[in-house]
């Protein structure tokens, strides 16, 4: 019985790659991947303030934008992304403002965030942003406190 419970727990939650794979194939979906090399080039053009210093910590980015997709695709995405937790990620912030939901999730090891996930749904918006890098939780907390 314990083994069955363990297997069920592992299977619970949506795998992030399968979400990207499923929805990037939808008509009018935009999926953009920015490689570490391109991120390095982009970093040459950002300023030197505290936000820019934080942005330098991220090595790659992947964006899934479903704004131009059909209502049924957006609803299906919203249900999948909001109904269950995403494997390996913890929710840092969740905001529901006039029908628009924003969640910021993180995958971390010790006190370092390795991946940051931003999910926006509602009011016609369906966007998923994945940032990979190494950022301390305290730096993200400061940024979130400033923005909220």
Predicted regions located by residue number:
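Extracytoplasmic
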Residues: 26-29, 56-58, 97-99, 113, ...
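Bacterial Sec-dependent N-terminal signal peptides
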Residues: 1-19
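A short, solvent-exposed beta-edge/loop patch
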Residues: 105-136
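A recognition module on extended beta-rich or small alphabeta surfaces enriched in W/G with H and D/E
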Residues: 141-148
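Mature, soluble, non-transmembrane domains
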Residues: 11, 97, 121-122
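Short Gly/Thr-rich strand-loop-strand
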Residues: 78, 82-108
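Surface-exposed flexible segments
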Residues: 72-85, 129-132
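Early exported N-terminus immediately downstream of N-terminal targeting peptides
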Residues: 16-77
């Amino acid at each position: 019985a314990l083994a069955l419970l363990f297997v069920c727990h592992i299977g619970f939650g949506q795998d992030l790659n399968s979400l990207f794979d499923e929805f990037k194939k939808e008509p009018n979906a935009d999926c953009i991947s920015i490689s570490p090399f391109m991120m390095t080039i982009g970093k040459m053009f950002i300023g030197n303030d505290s936000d820019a210093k934080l942005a330098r910590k991220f090595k790659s980015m992947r964006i899934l934008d479903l704004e131009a997709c059909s209502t049924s695709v957006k609803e299906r995405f919203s249900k999948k992304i909001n109904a269950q937790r995403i494997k390996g990620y913890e929710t840092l912030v969740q905001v529901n403002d006039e029908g628009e939901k924003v969640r910021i999730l993180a995958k971390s090891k010790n006190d370092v965030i390795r991946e940051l996930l931003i999910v926006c749904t509602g009011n016609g918006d369906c966007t998923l942003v994945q940032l990979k890098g190494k950022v301390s939780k305290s730096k993200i907390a400061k940024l979130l406190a400033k923005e909220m």
